[in-house]
Amino acid sequence: VLSVIGILFLGCAFFTSCISSGRVSTFVVLPDTQTYLEQCPEVFDSQVDWLVANRKKIDAVFQVGDLTQDNSPVEWAYMQKAFHRISQAGIPYSVVWGNHDIGSKPGQFSDVHNTAMANKYFPLSDYKQKSYWGGSADGKTLDNYYINLRSGDTDWLVLNLEFGPSDEALQWADSIVGIHPDKLVILNTHAYLYCDSTLHDGKDWWRPQGYGIGKEFGRTVNDGAGIWKKLLFRHRNVIAVFCGHVLKSGVGTLVSIGKEGNKVYQMLANYQRGVEGSRLGGEGYLRIVTFNRKTREIDVKTYSTWNKAYHPSEHHNFKFREVDFDEYLR
């Protein structure tokens, strides 16, 4: 059963009050960064500066894909340096490959499943040395992998799936979630939710099936509906999904009910050039998502590190209330 629920607007409280401790976990979601690199890298730099400055208040950073615009060595080197700064600040992070990060050569967006450039600059050999490393689907790349996080008294498992994950990748992810019933699960992926707050289902032109990715292997690629049906719906401990990719308004929110009755809170956030009202490649907007087991709330705020202000719209700052966190782990 899929349903869009009313989201209650929250006046923008200060992030400084969201220090992670006890029963509170604070994660930052970095939406598509691609157009910063070709238009205004200084705005992206402001995001990294802000993350480093607030490192003691952040449990992890999740980037939702399209790190680059053209999948070029220059862009990848820039992103590698940026995430090295985040890592050196002691902040756990994960990244996923978007359609602009995959392709036969720079500027060919997911025409084939070639992630060589991404994995050259974000190699598994480096990433698996991190204390929060979980595992990789193929044991060779960061195409599909998971990490483990401990925040306060909560254990988290974060699945990171590439643009248009294959059936094999979903089968692997299904097995990983299945053997960790004691952890709250978040999915971080690129293409999942549409801007009308519905799942990608093969009918919209942003769907992974509209690209060449996977065709050279004759393999199935999955959109949001496929990921939901084959993976997320099946597990009680899945609580949230973060994604990007889609333009128009660039935002969407959906709450779906899993097989075991658990609510899954799914959020699309994208501010890149091409999104309605976008300026400066995205104006440095990022999402601050706080899971508060004490108040039973998920608090979402959207903050511009460039403007040093929260987004003025209620569609970007809201709360999910009456979240029974304990129910996910029974």
PLM features: what roles do these ranges have?
Residues 22, 170, 180-238:
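Active-site-proximal segments of metal-dependent phosphoesterases and phosphodiesterases across multiple
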Residues 73-172, 178-181, 210, 251-272, ...:
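Extended active-site neighborhood of metal-dependent phosphoesterases/phosphodiesterases
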Residues 17-75, 205-208:
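N-terminal active-site segment of His-dependent metallophosphoesterases
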Residues 23-26, 56-61, 88-94, 151-157, ...:
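Loop/turn elements at helix/coil->beta-strand transitions in domains of secreted/extracellular proteins
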Residues 279-330:
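A short C-terminal boundary segment appended to hydrolase-like catalytic domains
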Residues 36-38, 69-72, 97-106, 142-145, ...:
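Active-site environment of divalent metal-dependent phosphoester hydrolases
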Residues 211-212, 216-293:
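Conserved beta-sheet core of the metallophosphoesterase superfamily
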Residues 29-31, 59-66, 92-99, 161, ...:
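Active-site neighborhood of phospho(di)ester-bond hydrolases with catalytic His/Asp-centered motifs
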